[in-house]
Amino acid sequence: MDEGWFNATLDEQYELIKTLKSNDDTQIHVLRHRTLGRDMVKRVYKGTGEVYKLLRSLAHPNIVNVYEVFTGSDYTVVLEEYINGQTVAEVLETGLYHTRGAINIVHALCDALEILHTKGIIHRDIKPENIMIDEAGMVKLIDFDAAKLYKSYKSDDTRIMGTAGYAAPEQFGLAQSDERTDIFALGVLMNVMLTGSHPSKKLYSGKLKSIIEKCIQTNPGKRYQSVTQLQESL
């Protein structure tokens, strides 16, 4: 796909509505089709686009839809679904989740991750800011900029990616990230939704305590080994 043609077509068919994020590594804009009035997100980031290209052919109700991917010389442009709703982070600004609400969100994320992990995709950045709840109450996992494909022949990750507090120890060069890396983040997420704090500061003391503790074990071998196992415990 020609870069000039791609950008010219976008400019001709879409108008800029708002900018959601803009820094040296990532720009995220909301565009609106000039004729149809439909909104979509244009994401520009420094990366290969390898995972987004796989997502383009993957449809799941709990994963943001990816429409098109263009790879430039040192960046990737992703056109994806615009989700009208709130992030879990925005919901937490108004109050904590009840146990059932937190379980429902994690169940939905496990459904999404089961499909992703089957394809070898590890998200590596599950956190409240990357989980949307749309107007119909549907949970959507977004932002795959830090995601990677699991490669069995590798001993560690090529690049250190993720968010401090939610990233598992192996994301910092100790081993290769795998499905258990995302399970670690789910444990932290549950604790934050229920207490407002990282488990190292305030560990949830209710019925989900043992589940959270198992998710966030430093040793991946002591965590749940799959999201299916986690769902069964929930």
Residue ranges and their predicted role:
Residues 13-53:
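ATP-binding glycine-rich loop module of kinase domains
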Residues 105-106:
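Activation segment signature within eukaryotic-like protein kinase domains
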Residues 157-170:
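Conserved activation segment of eukaryotic-like protein kinases, specifically the C-terminal portion
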Residues 117-133:
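Catalytic-loop of the protein kinase fold
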Residues 73-87, 91:
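Conserved short submotifs of the Hanks-type protein kinase catalytic core
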Residues 223:
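Conserved HRD-motif arginine in the catalytic loop of eukaryotic-like protein kinases
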Residues 59-68:
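Conserved HxN/HPN-centered segment at the entrance to the catalytic loop
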